[in-house]
């Protein structure tokens, strides 16, 4: 049965790993403190559609490697998340630190990325 299922789809991996940043309760608390209109927003809902980042996989063998990689770039990830909610920088937490980042986000690392599509990968430039 497994062979039949897998033959129905193209199956190959790509040379990337995935890092997912899942917001934690302090992130939700900040969102609600700035704008009470998403009053019914729950942590579960906030975590339903997290950003996922494809990264080169050869530098990360273990989840700890991915955590170190993210921690070296924490400011960028933090600002991306905050800007997705509020562009006005005066609303952003003023004293952001690596400790705050760790309190706000859970880092998930997925080393195996399967491409089950037969269509081309298209890169969209957001600049």
Description of each model-found segment:
Residues 2-60, 65:
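Extended, charge-biased low-complexity segments
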Residues 9-11, 44-45, 90-93, 125-126:
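A general structural signal for short secondary-structure junctions and capping/turn motifs
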Residues 30-31, 124-126:
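Short, solvent-exposed polar/charged micro-motifs at secondary-structure junctions
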Residues 56-124:
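Amphipathic protein-protein interaction modules
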């Amino acid at each position: 049965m497994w062979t039949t299922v897998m033959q129905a789809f193209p199956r190959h991996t790509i040379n990337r790993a995935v890092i997912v940043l899942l917001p934690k309760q302090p992130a939700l608390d900040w969102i609600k403190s700035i704008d009470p209109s998403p009053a019914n927003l729950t942590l579960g809902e906030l975590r339903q559609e997290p950003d996922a980042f494809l990264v080169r996989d050869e530098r990360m063998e273990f989840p700890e490697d991915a955590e170190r990689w993210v921690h070296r770039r924490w400011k960028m990830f933090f600002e991306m998340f905050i800007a997705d909610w509020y562009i006005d920088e005066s609303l952003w937490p003023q004293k952001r630190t690596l400790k705050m980042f760790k309190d706000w986000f859970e880092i998930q690392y997925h080393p195996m990325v399967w491409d089950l599509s037969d269509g081309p990968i298209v890169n969209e430039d957001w600049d």
